[in-house]
Every structure is written in C-alpha cells, then in structure tokens.
C-alpha cells in the first residue's frame, strides 16, 4: 500500500497481533516449548474439544444402534467399548481438563498476575493430560479393542479373567498419567491464587471464577490421588495377582467406595468452575454487580465440603451403606446450590438484560441444570432410587446435570472470552444458531430418557425387544442426538472463520461492562498480561477503571446494609 493511499484515508488491513515471522514449523515449535499460560490455555481448549467431538461421535453410534430393536451394526462387545470410552472421554479427557483450560486463560489475568506460579509445571501438566488421554484411547487400535467394563470400572468386571485384553491396561495407565497432570495443574492454581495476587487483590476481592478454581483445585488434591492409588491397585490385581479387589474379601465394595469417593467430588470438580463462568457472565449482561458475592463464596465452600460426604448415594442398591445418612447429606447439598440459583436470579432481577450469545448459553445452563438438580433430589430418596437405579432415568439425570453445567457453560465462556484470547469477536448470528440447535437437540435427546427409565429400560444395553415398547421414545432421543451433533458445525465454522477474519477488537472490554481485571488489559494481552494495573479497591476493578464517575455511587450503594447494621448497633448502645 502506497503512502498516497494511506494519506488519502484508505482503509488498511490490520491484525490484532504482529505479522507472523520465523521459518516453517515455527508455530509447532512454539506450541511444544511454550510456557505462556494463555497459549497453554488455548491448547487445553483445542485438545479438549477434539476429545469432545470424539466422545460425541461414540454417543451418536450408540444412539443410532438404539433407534430400533435388534442389533443393527454394533455387536454387544463394541457397544460396551463405546459407552465405556464415551464416559471416560467426556468426563476425564474433556470436562476435567477444560477446567484447567479456562483457569489458564483467565485466572492469572483476573488476579493481576504475569503468569501462573510454575509455568514449566503448567506445560508439563498439559502434556501429561494429552499423552494420558492418548494412551487411554489407544485401546481402539489393539486387537482386543478398548476397555469395555464401563467408565466406573466395577470389579470383578475389570479383573484379568473378565477383561483380559490390553485395552483395559491402557485405560488404567492412561487415567493414571492424565490424573497426574490434573493433580499438578491443581497445585499450580492453588499456588498462583495464594502467592501471585496483585496489590490490593484481597481474597474477598477475587472474582467468583477465581474462587471457584481455588476450591476446585483443593477438591482435586483430595480426590485424584485416591483414584490414582485405586488404579495402581487394579493394575496390581490384573498383573501381579494382588487380590486387592477379590469378591471373596469384599473387594467389590472396596472398589466402589474408593471409586465413588473420587467420583462424587469429581462431579463438583467439573461443576464449580462452570458455576464460576456463569457468575462472571450474568453481571456483565445484566449491567449489575453480582448479587450476594460473599454468599456465593460461602456456597461454593459448602458444596465442596459436602461433596466429600455423599459418595455412597451411588451405592444405595448395594444394601451395604447407611441410607438415612447419605440420603440426608445428598438433600443437604441442594441448599448451597439453591443459594447460587437465588443469587444468579437476583443478579438478573430488574437488570438491563441483553441476550448476546454468552448470556444465552448461561441462561440455557440455568434452565438445564435446574431440571437436572430436581431429578437429583428425586434420586437422593432411596425408595425412588431403588425403582430407577441403573435405568435411563439415571442417564437422563446426569446428562442434564453434566451437559447442562459443563457444555452450556463451556460455550458461554468461549463466546465470552474469545475476544480476550484472540483479539477478534465471534459471529453473533452463528452463535445464536449454535445455541438453539444445542438447546433443542439436548432436550429432545434426554428429556424422553426420564420416561424410558421409568418404563424400565436399563442403561448400557445394546438391544431391547419390540414388545418392550421402548422404540418410540428411543427414536425421538436419537433424532435429538443428531440435532445436537449438527449444532457443532456452526460452532466449528464460527471459531475457524472468526479466528482468521472476525471483527477486530480494539478496546480492552468489548462487552462494555466487564468487572474483573482481565477486562483492564488489551485483547489479546501482552506476554506478561499487563503494562499497568488499575487500583484494586473492590471486586470490580475493571468496571471502576472504565466508569470512574460511578465509583462513589457504587461504594455508597454497596455498603448500605453494612452501614444500616452499624447504625442499629449504635442505637442499641445508646
């Protein structure tokens, strides 16, 4: 472009980052050697979405098989491998690591840190997860196929007699390696939050997302080492004849206790960070501060504490656990979750709501998770649980809870923070199409499964009889699953197109009302995140930076309750 053209005011193509330099293969070298938390966060997200698509493909194969009675194109053995690997991929190779994807992308920015506490350990955690997941999935290319004993790996199904193939061993080792990556990631996040907060960033000025990652990381340190130990025991059983999980010694129940003491905190490990994501999004699109900040923090801590006291509700049907205690504790965990809902609704109440794509996905999360939570309260009652245990009612319940939380909030977070990651905005029209396809597809797939479960359709069966009367609802469910699968196409195209050609973000805060510190630096941020930090005087430093004329009023309104309490104390003293 000539100097004349520039002086005449002609538009010049700009990029949100410097032009690419370096020889061919430079990007690959950079990815392999990087210790930049933002780059690692993007790598986590991309890797997790690849696993998400693979897990979704396995689910589509299962739903196609179940659309009609009789075995269509899968054998019983193949079906067993599919549901085992589908559960494992979705929970341990997608949901858990994408927590650390978001934590890497956002947490150091939110606390004003230049990077995480241990950047090399951070990179090591990612590569452990990636190679662990690859090892776990490698069973598909072995002669005996992948693991086929269910993602819960109940003994004696997992012993050397019932699962002799190498697929089971690869599954065990893959989970051990990927789990180590998760443990190290949690150590890193705890240290980062405790040691690297910017001046003025007290614990109760941290964003809710940062709080939730901190609590989640503590839960990881409680739960994942136990899983690792249990898996090593299982490997010893299979190869050394250790007899740890022998049925004769009560080993079957031992495995269930060990697994679910990991498994239930794991459910909250993959829920709390996503509660944090929507807690960041609701205030921005409601044009209001988060309602009940401190109660949200205490609710998060309560959920974490209770989550390690309810594991045996997965074992009601064994008849070997104290039903009243675990039933009551499970009911109890609904209380802090209800407080969170109250706060989210309170944040939106009388706000100036706008429904951009992140807000749509957040509302979709709230609706779906609420329904899943209500069926969870039903399942907490042992008499009801005995009726529907191991049926499609349970499948519908945990998909409502997990898909509602993880997938809807993941998409909300990606649409929300994509401009911060890349310096470009995602396409709103494609985003709305993506949301409605996801929402309609999901509810069509899983709502009818509650009724299938109540009618008595067991989970994990590859086939059913024409006389069972399950076909009609199964066809509806399968149609919904293909709508859900189709929803990924606008998303992938949107990310690809926007990353390369999307609208360039030229401001720190493209949404206009961001609260936390990540909206006080450029899009994308410089290598060490900030060229200068604003003063941190509340939990909304970026908002106060962009709206300085509002600070006095915000202070005045924020402390009305506290001031009123002080006045009451003074009156009572006089």
From Swiss-Prot:
Subcellular location: Cell membrane
Pathways involved: Energy metabolism; oxidative phosphorylation
A GO biological process held by the record: respiratory electron transport chain
Annotated residues for binding of heme a3: 397
Species lineage: Bacteria, Bacillati, Actinomycetota, Actinomycetes, Mycobacteriales
Enzyme class: translocase
Protein name: Probable cytochrome c oxidase subunit 1
Family to which the UniProt record says this protein belongs: Belongs to the heme-copper respiratory oxidase family.
Organism encoding this protein: Mycobacterium leprae (strain TN)
List of residues binding Cu cation: 264, 268, 313-314
Catalytic activity from the UniProt record: 4 Fe(II)-[cytochrome c] + O2 + 8 H(+)(in) = 4 Fe(III)-[cytochrome c] + 2 H2O + 4 H(+)(out)
Subunit structure: Associates with subunits II, III and IV to form cytochrome c oxidase.
Crosslinked positions (1'-histidyl-3'-tyrosine (His-Tyr)): 264-268
Database matches in PROSITE patterns: COX1, COX1_CUB
Role played: Cytochrome c oxidase is the component of the respiratory chain that catalyzes the reduction of oxygen to water. Subunits 1-3 form the functional core of the enzyme complex. CO I is the catalytic subunit of the enzyme. Electrons originating in cytochrome c are transferred via the copper A center of subunit 2 and heme A of subunit 1 to the bimetallic center formed by heme A3 and copper B.
Sections of the chain in a coiled coil: none
Residues engaged in binding Fe(II)-heme a: 86, 399
Membrane-crossing residue ranges in chain numbering: 40-60, 89-109, 121-141, 170-190, 213-233, 258-278, 290-310, 315-335, 359-379, 398-418, 433-453, 476-496
One cellular component term from this protein's GO annotations in UniProt: plasma membrane
Topology within the bilayer: Multi-pass membrane protein
EC number: 7.1.1.9
Cofactor(s) recorded in Swiss-Prot or TrEMBL: Cu(2+); heme
């Amino acid at each position: 472009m000539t100097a004349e053209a520039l002086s005449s005011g002609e538009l010049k193509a700009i990029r949100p980052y410097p032009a690419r330099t370096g020889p061919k293969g430079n990007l690959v070298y950079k990815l392999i050697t990087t210790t930049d938390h933002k780059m690692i966060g993007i790598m986590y997200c991309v890797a997790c979405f690849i696993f998400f698509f693979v897990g979704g493909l396995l689910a589509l194969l299962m739903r196609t098989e179940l659309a009609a009675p009789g075995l269509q194109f899968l054998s019983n053995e193949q079906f067993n491998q599919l549901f085992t690997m589908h559960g494992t991929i979705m929970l341990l190779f997608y949901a858990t690591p994408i927590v650390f994807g978001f934590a890497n992308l956002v947490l150091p920015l939110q606390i004003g840190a230049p990077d995480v506490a241990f950047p090399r350990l951070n990179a090591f955690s990612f590569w452990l997860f990636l190679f662990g997941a690859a090892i776990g999935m490698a069973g598909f290319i072995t002669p005996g196929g992948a693991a086929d004993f269910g993602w819960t790996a109940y003994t004696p199904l997992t012993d050397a007699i019932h699962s002799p193939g190498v697929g089971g061993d690869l599954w065990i080792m893959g989970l051990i390696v990927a789990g180590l990556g998760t443990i190290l990631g949690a150590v890193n996040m705890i240290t980062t939050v405790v040691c690297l907060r910017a001046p003025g960033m007290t614990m109760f000025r941290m964003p809710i997302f940062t709080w939730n990652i901190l609590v989640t990381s503590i839960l990881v340190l409680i739960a994942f080492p136990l899983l690792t130990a249990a898996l090593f025991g299982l490997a010893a059983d299979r190869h050394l004849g250790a007899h740890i999980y022998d049925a004769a010694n009560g080993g079957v129940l031992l495995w269930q206790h060990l697994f679910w003491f990991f498994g239930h905190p794991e459910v909250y490990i993959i829920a709390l960070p996503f509660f944090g994501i929507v807690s960041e999004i609701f205030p921005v699109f409601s044009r209001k501060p988060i309602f009940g900040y401190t109660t949200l923090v205490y609710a998060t801590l309560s959920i974490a504490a209770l989550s390690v006291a309810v594991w045996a509700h997965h074992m009601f049907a064994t008849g070997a656990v104290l039903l009243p205690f675990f039933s009551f504790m499970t009911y109890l965990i609904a209380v802090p979750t209800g407080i969170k809902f109250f706060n989210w609704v309170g944040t939106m109440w009388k706000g100036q709501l706008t429904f951009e794509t992140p807000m749509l996905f957040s509302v979709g999360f709230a609706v779906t998770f609420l329904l899943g939570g209500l069926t969870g309260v039903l399942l907490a009652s042992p008499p009801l649980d005995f009726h529907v245990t191991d049926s499609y009612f349970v499948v519908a319940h945990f998909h409502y809870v997990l898909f509602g939380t993880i997938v809807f909030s993941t998409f909300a977070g990606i649409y929300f923070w994509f401009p911060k990651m890349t310096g470009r905005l995602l396409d709103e029209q494609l985003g709305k199409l993506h949301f409605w396809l996801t929402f309609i597809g999901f509810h069509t797939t899983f709502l009818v499964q509650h009724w299938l479960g109540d009618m008595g359709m067991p989970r994990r069966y590859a086939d059913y009889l024409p006389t069972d009367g399950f076909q009609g609802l199964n066809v509806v469910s399968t149609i919904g699953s293909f709508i859900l699968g189709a929803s990924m196409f606008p998303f992938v195209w949107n990310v690809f197109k926007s990353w390369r050609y999307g609208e360039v973000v030229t401001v720190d805060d493209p949404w206009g009302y961001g609260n936390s510190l990540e909206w006080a630096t450029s899009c994308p941020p410089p290598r060490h995140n900030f060229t200068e930090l604003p003063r941190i005087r509340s939990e909304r430093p970026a908002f106060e930076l962009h709206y300085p004329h509002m600070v006095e009023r915000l202070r005045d309104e924020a402390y009305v309750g506290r001031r009123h309490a002080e006045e009451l104390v003074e009156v009572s003293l006089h």
